[in-house]
UniProtKB/Swiss-Prot annotation:
Belongs to the universal ribosomal protein uL3 family. Residues 134-154 are annotated as: Disordered. The keyword Calcium does not apply. One of the primary rRNA binding proteins, it binds directly near the 3'-end of the 23S rRNA, where it nucleates assembly of the 50S subunit. This is Large ribosomal subunit protein uL3.
Amino acid sequence: MSIGLIGRKCGMTRIFTETGSSIPVTVVEVIPNRITQVKTVETDGYRAFQVAYGKKSSARVNKPLAGHYSKAAVEAGNALREFRLGNEELTEAKAGDELKVDIFKEGQVVDVRGLTRGKGFAGTVKHHNFRTQDATHGNSLSHRAPGSIGQCQTPGRVWKGKKMAGQLGNVYCTVQSQEIIKVDVERNLLLIKGALPGAPGGEVIITQSSKKRKEDK
């Protein structure tokens, strides 16, 4: 993983190009991320930044974390995340510095990770896209039942990982190779092409893309 930012998903809109084409974008607000710790090869075996995002009352921070924030001379945050760094990335930055949206540029491709919307307990039709059974012709009880979930005496059990009913959503999801359409430094906004995981107001983590798009190869 390379350097990234923690932001808040605001919602979706669209923008128009000079030729009149409509591009759907997700608006992400990135409050400046405060560096709380710089990890180095000499002390930790790898290079990384630990950053804090948002604000939290000092009364709601436990003593170990309060000491950690105090050592870096930064305000306590809602979230604390770590980003691995390459050998040449941000070599001059130090604890207490702020990372803003200007570390990204328009046209850059990024990966975005967020917590998907929780949809509660769902059956196999909604959860795993199973087909329904017959609506008529003698079927009166099992229209949306999954059917057989195992075999006979051999192996005599249900395989681990079998697709069944259960919790849907509320898991972390990463979308890759999303293009940054616009960087608004004044308002701390990123406009990223397409949809991003999570509900409006949810936390998202934006990092440089780990893959190259076909047109970039």
